[in-house]
Structure formats: structure tokens, C-alpha cells
């Protein structure tokens, strides 16, 4: 989700995993969360995310795309690397269509039972946050239908959202070959705390946010235990 103006080293873990698939001949698809950034992922949070405006999101998406192309190589053809946002999917869909075509295939009880929703359940989950989970599922469904995407990769805190997409595809399409998902570990400190935007302690991929010197020193100064966790 484009809720900041730069990706972080946490995003880099998933991107490098996708890059390895690309090296072995797979087509890589990077989905940038435009519409979903307006709401924010409630997973493993004890409070609702702050609202992010559309103008800021468009600026962030532009920055994200430039950073992704640095990882994959700026000369990658669209047939090998597709970078797209998810705003058009939802802008072109009426609320009635969203509820009848998508909502009827999603089990609310399953979403509410997730461990990732526990903190938000206790504080009060908004309808918008619940809808976010359905939007995540629809993202995978759209890529499966129109881009022949068969595997979704995300951080292991996204496992529930990935499974929702897999279930939606199965219920709507009954595919001969099921959609699949895989997760990568989150970057954490030695004490287990997450390194990322939501923790307030990110290491940015933007030179303006984290200078090359600071980026270099972050890796040099890792403890042995943290270096093993990052490997």
C-alpha cells in the first residue's frame, strides 16, 4: 500500500523473492495499493490507520514504481515485469456489484477469527477495515483473471489476506489449477519487534529518507543474531 513516499527494506525482501522467480523465467507482477491505501490494512494493529489522501498516494505510487524498476532493471519489458495499481479495479466497480459479485463469496466469520484481527476486534473493527480484507482478496482475483497470475507473494503478516484471495478465486471460478500463495519472513530486531513503516523505525530505500551512508551502516551494525535473522 502506498501509504508512504518510499519503500523500505521490509518491502525489499518480497521484491527480491519475486526477482528470483523472474530470473527463472516467470513474469513478475508488482501490485501497488492505491485504493487499499485509502483505508489501510488492519492486520495486527490495535488502532485504525491514519487516512492518506489521494494526491499523496499518487505521488507515493510514482516513487514506488521508480524504486521497483531499480530492483528489476529499468529495461524490463512489460511482458516480463508488470507494475500496476489497484485503483481502477475499484473505481470501475459499483458498490452493488462489489457486494453481490464479491461479498457473497467471502465468509465474514473466517476473517474475524483471524489472529491478525484480534487486536482490532477488541478495540472495534470498522466496516471500512473489514472491507479492506475483501479488497485484498479481490486484488488477487483480478490478477488471476486478467494477468494469468497464479502465485501471490507477501510478508507472513499477509497470510490471511492471501488465503482470502485464494478462497475467492476457488469459489468464483472453480479453477482446474488452484491459485497459490507464499509468504516471506518479516524483518525483525533481536527482540522480535518489527522493522517497518508501522513500527515507526523503517530503513527506507529512498536516498532522501535514508542516506547511502545510513543504509550501509544499518547493515554493518547489525548484531550477529540480527544478521542471521535477515539472511
What is each stretch, according to the model?
Residues 1-158, 162-166, 172-180, 193:
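NTP-dependent nucleotidyl-transfer catalytic core
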Residues 104-107, 185-231:
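Catalytic adenosine-cofactor/nucleotide-binding cores of aminoacyl-tRNA synthetases and other
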